[in-house]
Amino acid sequence: MERADSAADEEQVFVTLTVADQLCGVPVLGVRDILGEQAITRIPLAPPEIAGSLNLRGRIVTAIDLRRRLQLPAAPSGEKRMSVVAEQGGELYALLVDQVSEVMSLKSSAFEQNPPTLTKTWAAFSTGVYRLDGRLLVVLDVGKLLNMADAG
């Protein structure tokens, strides 16, 4: 009996971020770095969700605009954005977000499946949600976000 209770009380740790006023979380173990505003070089003929590339300590990193990836309106011109760096298949990717907030531990027992009201695009890139003080934290699946075969 105790074992089942302790499993329900396990905590998941997330880096919380905001994309177009939506609170999101990505598992902290998948995050390599958090970056402030970076110079991004546009890549000709790249899909629209590829913002370009940036230099991270001498390593070229593909920058993915999460607003475009999630089919949201573009960020206001001149708005400073942050990057959450994740690794997939040995390559580094920077997910451009509006803001990175905090690292948060949440009980696994509070995790819920995606609600039916979540748009098709959001549901395709999320694993579920947490309800926090009247806000919905959408847990993003970084692997799916980085799979460009699912683009558009």
List where the protein language model places each region:
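An acidic, low-aromatic, low-complexity terminal/linker signal
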Residues: M1-G152
